[in-house]
């Protein structure tokens, strides 16, 4: 794949969703964050703050609310990046993920969404072995933690996460597929690629059903 001129690389931001986080710097380090990021922390209080991390200023939005879709929407509406990754707090990103995201949006210039692979010790998720275009017949196999979006395409088409579905709501899942379904209904272009973007860690108690 053709290398991208560093000066022409577009900005990638990781939108990190977590629940009751007490150590934000530790979270960023554990996730191997190398770019701009934002943290949405669903907890028992309301506070907007920022932390310094590896010469970056990372905004932290702590809100007394629940629902992973709501958490992602709160971050998405505040992002200014060209491309966004939806970062669950159990992900460990590969080195150079910003360059990887740029490479695949360069490879597929009409793409609005790129779906990457997630690596895990026990394979439970669909693994893309050869790049293909995502459509209404195959989109339900993918979750939000493995996708990168062209932020402007999502916002211009009025797409967001359904706040009635997903962790922390009455319906504990489904917000991922509803999001991708909305993208397809708006005729956005989605590609699944064989590149791994992150690893799933298994060293914490999941907060998925809390928020």
Features from the language model and the residues they span:
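Active-site acidic Asp-centered loop
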Residues: 42, 87-90
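Acidic donor-binding loop at a coil-to-helix junction in glycosyltransferase catalytic cores
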Residues: 166-178
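Conserved donor NDP-sugar-binding/catalytic core segment of glycosyltransferases
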Residues: 92-128
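Glycine-rich, basic loop-to-helix element that forms the pyrophosphate-binding segment
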Residues: 62-79
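Short aromatic/hydrophobic "clamp" motif used to bind/position activated sugar donors
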Residues: 84
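N-proximal low-complexity "stem/linker" segments adjacent to membrane-targeting elements
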Residues: 1-38
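Conserved nucleotide-sugar donor-binding
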Residues: 81, 143-160
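Catalytic beta-strand/loop signature of glycosyltransferases that borders the donor
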Residues: 161-163, 187-199
């Amino acid at each position: 794949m053709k290398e991208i001129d560093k000066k022409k690389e577009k900005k990638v931001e990781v939108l990190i969703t977590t629940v009751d986080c007490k150590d934000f710097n530790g979270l960023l380090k554990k996730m191997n964050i190398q770019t701009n990021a934002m943290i949405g922390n669903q907890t028992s209080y309301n506070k907007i703050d920022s932390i310094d991390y590896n010469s970056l200023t990372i905004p932290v939005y702590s809100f007394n609310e629940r629902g992973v879709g709501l958490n992602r929407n709160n971050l998405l509406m505040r992002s200014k990046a060209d491309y966004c990754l939806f970062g669950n707090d159990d992900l460990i990103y590969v080195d150079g993920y910003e360059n990887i995201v740029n490479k695949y949006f360069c490879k597929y210039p009409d793409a609005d969404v790129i779906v990457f692979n997630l690596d895990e010790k026990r394979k439970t998720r669909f693994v893309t072995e050869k790049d293909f275009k995502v459509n209404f017949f195959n989109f339900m196999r993918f979750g939000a933690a493995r996708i990168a979006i062209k932020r402007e395409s999502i916002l211009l088409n009025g797409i967001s996460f359904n706040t009635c579905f997903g962790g922390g709501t009455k319906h504990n899942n489904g917000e991922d597929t509803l999001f991708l379904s909305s993208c397809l209904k708006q005729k956005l272009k989605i590609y699944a690629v064989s590149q791994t973007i992150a690893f799933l860690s298994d060293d914490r108690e999941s907060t998925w059903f809390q928020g």
